Amino acid sequence: MFRAALIAICLAVFPTALAHAAGKTHEVRIEGMKFVPERIEVATGDTVVWTNKDFLSHSVTAKEARVESGDLAPSKSWRFVARKTGEMPYICRLHPVMKGVLLVR
Protein backbone atom coordinates (compact mmCIF):
# COMPACT_ATOMS: atom_id res chain seq x y z
CA MET A 1 0.00 0.00 0.00
CA PHE A 2 2.75 2.42 0.99
CA ARG A 3 4.70 1.63 -2.17
CA ALA A 4 1.68 2.26 -4.41
CA ALA A 5 1.03 5.60 -2.70
CA LEU A 6 4.69 6.60 -3.10
CA ILE A 7 4.63 5.73 -6.80
CA ALA A 8 1.40 7.70 -7.28
CA ILE A 9 2.93 10.75 -5.58
CA CYS A 10 6.10 10.52 -7.69
CA LEU A 11 4.10 10.25 -10.90
CA ALA A 12 2.01 13.26 -9.93
CA VAL A 13 4.98 15.45 -8.93
CA PHE A 14 7.69 14.44 -11.43
CA PRO A 15 6.03 15.68 -14.67
CA THR A 16 5.44 19.08 -13.04
CA ALA A 17 9.04 19.32 -11.86
CA LEU A 18 10.30 18.23 -15.27
CA ALA A 19 8.16 20.82 -17.08
CA HIS A 20 9.42 23.57 -14.76
CA ALA A 21 13.06 22.52 -15.24
CA ALA A 22 12.69 22.62 -19.02
CA GLY A 23 11.47 26.22 -18.97
CA LYS A 24 9.15 28.01 -21.35
CA THR A 25 9.64 28.85 -25.01
CA HIS A 26 9.25 32.46 -26.14
CA GLU A 27 8.97 33.66 -29.74
CA VAL A 28 10.54 36.75 -31.30
CA ARG A 29 9.64 37.51 -34.91
CA ILE A 30 12.00 39.34 -37.23
CA GLU A 31 9.84 41.30 -39.66
CA GLY A 32 9.71 44.74 -41.22
CA MET A 33 13.34 45.37 -40.19
CA LYS A 34 12.37 44.98 -36.49
CA PHE A 35 12.51 42.45 -33.68
CA VAL A 36 8.94 41.88 -32.47
CA PRO A 37 8.74 42.28 -29.53
CA GLU A 38 11.79 44.53 -29.22
CA ARG A 39 12.05 43.80 -25.48
CA ILE A 40 11.31 40.41 -23.95
CA GLU A 41 11.58 39.19 -20.37
CA VAL A 42 12.25 35.51 -19.65
CA ALA A 43 13.29 33.30 -16.75
CA THR A 44 16.59 31.48 -16.45
CA GLY A 45 16.28 28.21 -18.35
CA ASP A 46 13.71 29.55 -20.81
CA THR A 47 14.27 29.23 -24.55
CA VAL A 48 13.90 32.14 -26.96
CA VAL A 49 13.29 31.37 -30.64
CA TRP A 50 13.91 34.12 -33.19
CA THR A 51 12.21 33.46 -36.55
CA ASN A 52 13.06 35.52 -39.62
CA LYS A 53 9.78 36.42 -41.34
CA ASP A 54 11.43 39.16 -43.38
CA PHE A 55 12.64 38.93 -46.99
CA LEU A 56 16.26 39.74 -46.03
CA SER A 57 18.76 37.78 -43.96
CA HIS A 58 19.25 38.98 -40.38
CA SER A 59 21.18 38.02 -37.26
CA VAL A 60 20.84 38.11 -33.49
CA THR A 61 24.12 39.51 -32.18
CA ALA A 62 24.90 40.42 -28.56
CA LYS A 63 28.58 41.35 -28.48
CA GLU A 64 28.87 41.81 -24.70
CA ALA A 65 27.22 38.44 -24.02
CA ARG A 66 29.16 36.79 -26.86
CA VAL A 67 25.96 35.56 -28.50
CA GLU A 68 25.77 35.21 -32.29
CA SER A 69 23.11 33.46 -34.32
CA GLY A 70 24.94 33.67 -37.61
CA ASP A 71 22.99 34.81 -40.65
CA LEU A 72 19.33 33.78 -40.58
CA ALA A 73 17.93 33.47 -44.09
CA PRO A 74 14.23 34.23 -44.61
CA SER A 75 11.98 31.70 -42.80
CA LYS A 76 14.89 30.33 -40.72
CA SER A 77 14.90 30.23 -36.90
CA TRP A 78 17.50 30.25 -34.14
CA ARG A 79 17.11 29.03 -30.55
CA PHE A 80 18.86 30.37 -27.46
CA VAL A 81 18.56 29.08 -23.89
CA ALA A 82 18.83 31.88 -21.31
CA ARG A 83 21.29 30.65 -18.69
CA LYS A 84 22.63 33.86 -17.14
CA THR A 85 20.54 36.57 -15.47
CA GLY A 86 20.79 40.16 -16.63
CA GLU A 87 20.00 42.42 -19.54
CA MET A 88 21.27 41.37 -22.96
CA PRO A 89 20.97 44.10 -25.59
CA TYR A 90 21.31 42.73 -29.12
CA ILE A 91 21.29 43.95 -32.71
CA CYS A 92 21.14 42.59 -36.22
CA ARG A 93 24.79 42.54 -37.29
CA LEU A 94 23.72 43.05 -40.93
CA HIS A 95 21.35 45.95 -40.11
CA PRO A 96 22.58 47.61 -36.87
CA VAL A 97 19.55 49.92 -36.67
CA MET A 98 17.57 46.82 -35.63
CA LYS A 99 17.82 46.52 -31.84
CA GLY A 100 16.31 44.38 -29.13
CA VAL A 101 16.73 43.56 -25.46
CA LEU A 102 16.49 40.19 -23.73
CA LEU A 103 15.99 40.50 -19.97
CA VAL A 104 16.69 37.29 -18.06
CA ARG A 105 15.39 37.09 -14.47
Q: Where do the PLM segments sit?
A:
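Extracytoplasmic copper-binding redox domains, predominantly the cupredoxin/blue-copper superfamily
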Residues: 2, 10, 17-105
